[in-house]
């Protein structure tokens, strides 16, 4: 079982930051998104997903045992999402072994000053759209995840428009940050300070489009 550590210092002056991570190449990621299983908890089957949890020991990334994702309805009101244990297939070990995947975890942990014993959850997500159906990267609407820190690392945008990520201090106010995340972009967010949302995606031309991202959280919310 994961530890939610009281010693995590949230006085650290990190609120949110957006940066391009030039040291991480997208090469090698694409094939691992092509075979993602469908998210069984999303009604319209437009999302594909894997999930694993890790800890960082020094600069060694250590995969943790399989577990279940749990968020309360107060954070995730989507039917079949909140207040239930959700189980997803693990991220492929061959992907975990990639140098660029491990660099991504190190960049997240270093930037957010993640406690050495804190778990990191990594969600590998593809959201698809078609001429007849938009894809919704954030079916929860404007929300928090119920964790300390969130990282969104953009891997690919294929034949899509939309998909802008917004940050809010209040649901009733305009976003304080709004940007389409392009491949190699990393957005880091203090989940205690900001709500987040990503707008739906639609295809640019009349064929399937998709958005590929890794979402990193600490704590992992996996039990």
Give each language-model segment a name.
Residues 51, 57, 123-125, 154, ...:
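Structured loops at beta-to-helix junctions and adjacent beta-edge loops in soluble globular domains
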Residues 61-121:
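Signature of the catalytic double-stranded beta-helix
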Residues 5-13, 79-91, 163:
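Glycine-rich, often proline-containing surface loops adjacent to acidic residues and nearby aromatics
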Residues 53, 141, 150-152, 186-188, ...:
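Conserved hydrophobic/aromatic beta-strand scaffold that supports enzyme active sites
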Residues 1-78:
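N-terminal auxiliary "cap/dimerization" subdomain that precedes the catalytic jelly-roll/cupin core
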Residues 114-182:
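Catalytic core of non-heme Fe(II) oxygenases with the double-stranded beta-helix
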Residues 163-223:
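Catalytic core of Fe(II)/2-oxoglutarate
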Residues 39-51, 110-124:
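Short glycine-rich, low-complexity/disordered patches
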């Amino acid at each position: 079982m994961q530890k939610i550590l009281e010693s995590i210092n949230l006085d650290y002056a990190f609120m949110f930051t957006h940066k391009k991570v030039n040291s991480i190449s997208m090469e090698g990621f694409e094939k691992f998104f092509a075979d993602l299983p469908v998210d069984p908890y999303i009604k319209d089957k437009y999302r594909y997903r894997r999930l694993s949890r890790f800890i960082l020991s020094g600069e060694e990334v250590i995969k943790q045992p399989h577990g279940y994702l749990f968020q309360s309805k107060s954070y995730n009101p989507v039917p079949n999402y909140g207040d239930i244990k959700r189980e997803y297939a693990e991220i492929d070990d061959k992907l975990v072994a990639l140098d660029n995947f491990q660099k991504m975890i190190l960049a997240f942990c270093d930037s957010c000053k993640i406690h050495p014993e804190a778990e990191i959850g990594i969600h590998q997500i593809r959201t698809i759209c078609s001429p007849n159906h938009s894809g919704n990267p954030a079916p929860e609407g404007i929300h928090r995840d119920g964790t300390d820190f969130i990282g969104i690392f953009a891997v690919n945008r294929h034949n899509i428009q939309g998909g802008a990520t917004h940050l809010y201090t209040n649901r009733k106010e305009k976003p304080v940050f709004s940007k389409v995340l392009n491949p190699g972009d990393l957005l880091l967010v203090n989940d205690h300070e900001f709500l987040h949302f990503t707008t739906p995606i639609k295809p640019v031309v009349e064929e399937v489009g998709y958005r590929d991202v890794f979402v990193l959280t600490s704590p992992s919310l996996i039990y």
